[in-house]
């Protein structure tokens, strides 16, 4: 990653960008934290240090100003370097920014051509000093660490790059969702998410609902469904999912095909009858959790799944609210046996 950044910077320098600034004049930014208090922006940035012995060395700087441009400039003047944000990894917004200065902040980030658009954007109200301290104690670049946490397929998180987020923000047919970070037991976690209604914060959902959101968006994250059977515990792990939507007569028909395997089995005899019952229980679990999440969206008129766009494409009519919509769920659970051997069943897949 460091080599890639160096190559990109070199290209800019050799093609006349930055008014022929040298490498020593550029501060490569990994993290930006934006808060808004008392009519001022409070900006914190993490700058990568060019240390051979410690590639994860970084420094944290904070300043404030009346405008974002003024605040970025203040930090640049403090360190006497040009802030290079083309490869920024993560931008954190506080709820103060969401509720008071979201439009202004997004307009600035989008219009400034020296800020990249492939970074992850999250929300957090925790003290940025505590967040950076906890992550730097792991000898990690803070912005890169948060981005890696989000994008890792084994972490059930909301993975939203800025370019996708801004398209949703400008889209009247779909509501936004963003990861919500907080410190839990001295760890910075991303187990929650904020969902919006017409660009206004509406609700915070937990990791169980994030799992359902990813499933409904065909996002193959590490997702587990737990059920109980005859006093034993069963964990079904999703390997891949295929979700489709169809609108008919004020109904959104949702078809979910899930392929996965039993990741953990506790005191359960895996004969053919039990396997069929376990798959049925897993299907019921997915159905109940999905229905619960859809009801949250419907009751709060949150169109995080883009139902208005589906309806518009079918009818050319703009829907003001999704509260009157009905949902039909058709869930198919497929047991993939590539990683598990069942002696009494010869077929590769069992479907119910």
Locations of regions flagged by a protein language model:
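Positively charged n-region of N-terminal signal peptides that target proteins for export
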Residues: 1-4
């Amino acid at each position: 990653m460091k080599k890639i950044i160096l190559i990109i910077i070199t290209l800019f320098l050799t093609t006349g960008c930055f008014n022929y600034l040298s490498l020593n004049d550029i501060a490569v930014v990994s993290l930006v934290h934006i808060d808004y208090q008392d009519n001022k922006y409070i900006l914190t940035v993490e700058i990568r240090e060019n240390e051979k012995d410690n590639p994860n060395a970084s420094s944290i700087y904070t300043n404030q100003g009346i405008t974002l441009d003024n605040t970025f400039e203040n930090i640049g003047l403090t360190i006497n370097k040009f802030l290079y944000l083309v490869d920024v990894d993560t931008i954190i917004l506080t709820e103060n920014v969401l509720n008071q200065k979201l439009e202004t902040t997004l307009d600035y980030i989008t219009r400034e051509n020296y800020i990249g658009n492939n970074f992850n954007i999250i929300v957090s109200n925790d003290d940025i000093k505590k967040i950076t301290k906890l992550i730097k104690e792991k000898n990690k670049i803070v912005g890169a660490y948060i981005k890696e946490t989000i994008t890792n397929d084994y972490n059930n998180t909301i993975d939203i790059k800025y370019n996708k987020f801004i398209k949703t923000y400008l889209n009247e047919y779909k509501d936004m969702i963003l990861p919500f970070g907080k410190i839990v037991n001295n760890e910075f976690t991303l187990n929650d998410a904020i969902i919006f209604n017409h660009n206004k914060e509406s609700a915070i959902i937990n990791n169980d609902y994030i799992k359902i959101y990813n499933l409904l968006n065909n996002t193959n994250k590490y997702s587990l469904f737990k059920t109980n059977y005859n006093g034993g515990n069963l964990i079904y792990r999703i390997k891949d999912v295929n979700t489709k939507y169809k609108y008919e007569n004020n109904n959104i028909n949702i078809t979910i095909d899930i392929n996965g395997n039993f990741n953990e089995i506790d005191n359960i005899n895996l004969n053919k009858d039990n396997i069929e019952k376990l798959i049925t229980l897993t299907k019921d679990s997915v159905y109940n959790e999905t229905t619960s999440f859809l009801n949250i969206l419907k009751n709060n008129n949150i169109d995080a799944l883009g139902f208005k766009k589906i309806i518009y494409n079918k009818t050319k009519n703009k829907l003001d609210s999704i509260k009157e919509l009905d949902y039909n769920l058709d869930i198919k659970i497929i047991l993939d046996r590539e990683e598990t051997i069942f002696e009494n069943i010869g077929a590769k897949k069992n479907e119910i």
